[in-house]
């Protein structure tokens, strides 16, 4: 493939910070698309939903089901908008790199932002930190800290390790699936440039793989939201 990400380095108090401009661009595009979806699909709401309102209500019902399957609604209802936003954001992010890629020289500008491990690990870290925040807020600091020593005190180091492993698996699972899909699409696109025979040979596999990638991207968005709500329920529910 030989494609590189456009990087920008900044010296901050003697420490070099490196920014991936393509990931920043694609995250901005993703956020803008999700914002437009929210704006367009929630205009002129009616008691009897029709058209685009059916879609957005289905998203809300779907995420409500995810939350209800993990915790009581009186605790989980406050996370409803979080789940909806997370599902839409990750789904859109997973889809952006499928139709095409924008490459300037050897620099890749247009891709799925979730094909970058920094992005997915940042998302998973934010979600795990959010579970700790709500665990303390809803259960109290003392009760929350005690939960790490249950059922026996020597479980504490194992539960700390579990927090790190949950963060890694949540982020790397999403990254691995999306990155692998884009790599194969890139290889098929390269094959398509090898004359008429290569184009014909790559056309059908590319269409099939793009369809499969849409399915995988949708499933991965669902899994990320589901696991986030599972982790949240473990932190805010007294019976966990």
UniProtKB/Swiss-Prot annotation:
A GO molecular-function descriptor: proton-transporting ATP synthase activity, rotational mechanism
Q: Which UniProt keywords apply?
A: ATP synthesis, Cell membrane, CF(0), Hydrogen ion transport, Ion transport, Membrane, Transmembrane, Transmembrane helix, Transport
- PROSITE patterns tied to this protein: ATPASE_A (PS00449)
Family annotation (Gene3D superfamilies): ATP synthase, F0 complex, subunit A
Report the domain of life of the source organism.
Answer: Bacteria
Biological processes, Gene Ontology terms: proton motive force-driven plasma membrane ATP synthesis
Q: Name one GO cellular component term.
A: proton-transporting ATP synthase complex
Q: How does it sit in the membrane?
A: Multi-pass membrane protein
The record's InterPro entries line, in alphabetical order, gives:
ATP_syn_F0_a_bact/chloroplast, ATP_synth_F0_asu, ATP_synth_F0_asu_AS, F0_ATP_A_sf
> Which HAMAP family does the protein's record reference?
ATP_synth_a_bact
Function, as annotated? Key component of the proton channel; it plays a direct role in the translocation of protons across the membrane.
Subunit structure, interactors included: F-type ATPases have 2 components, CF(1) - the catalytic core - and CF(0) - the membrane proton channel. CF(1) has five subunits: alpha(3), beta(3), gamma(1), delta(1), epsilon(1). CF(0) has three main subunits: a(1), b(2) and c(9-12). The alpha and beta chains form an alternating ring which encloses part of the gamma chain. CF(1) is attached to CF(0) by a central stalk formed by the gamma and epsilon chains, while a peripheral stalk is formed by the delta and b chains.
Q: What is the official name of this protein in its record? A: ATP synthase subunit a
Which species is this UniProt entry from?
Macrococcus caseolyticus (strain JCSC5402)
């Amino acid at each position: 493939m030989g494609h590189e990400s456009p990087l920008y380095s900044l010296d901050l108090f003697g420490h070099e910070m490196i920014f991936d401009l393509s990931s920043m661009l694609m995250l901005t595009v993703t956020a803008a698309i999700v914002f437009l979806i929210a704006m367009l699909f929630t205009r002129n709401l009616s008691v009897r939903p029709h058209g685009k309102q059916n879609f957005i209500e289905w998203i809300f019902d779907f995420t409500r089901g995810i939350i209800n399957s993990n915790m009581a609604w009186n605790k989980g209802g406050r996370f409803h908008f979080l789940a909806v936003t997370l599902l839409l954001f990750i789904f859109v992010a997973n889809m952006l790199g499928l139709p095409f890629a924008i490459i300037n020289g050897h620099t890749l500008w247009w891709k799925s932002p979730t094909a970058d491990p920094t992005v997915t690990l940042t998302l998973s870290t934010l979600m795990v930190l959010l579970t700790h925040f709500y665990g303390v807020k809803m259960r109290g600091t003392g009760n929350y800290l005690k939960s790490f020593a249950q059922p026996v005190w020597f479980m504490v180091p194992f539960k700390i390790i579990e927090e790190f492993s949950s963060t890694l698996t949540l982020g790397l699972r999403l990254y691995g699936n999306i990155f692998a899909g884009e790599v194969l699409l890139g290889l098929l696109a390269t094959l398509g440039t090898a004359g008429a025979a290569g184009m014909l040979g790559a056309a059908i596999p590319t269409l099939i793989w793009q369809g499969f990638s849409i399915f995988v991207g949708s499933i991965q968005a669902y899994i990320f939201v589901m696991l986030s709500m599972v982790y949240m329920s473990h932190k805010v529910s007294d019976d966990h």
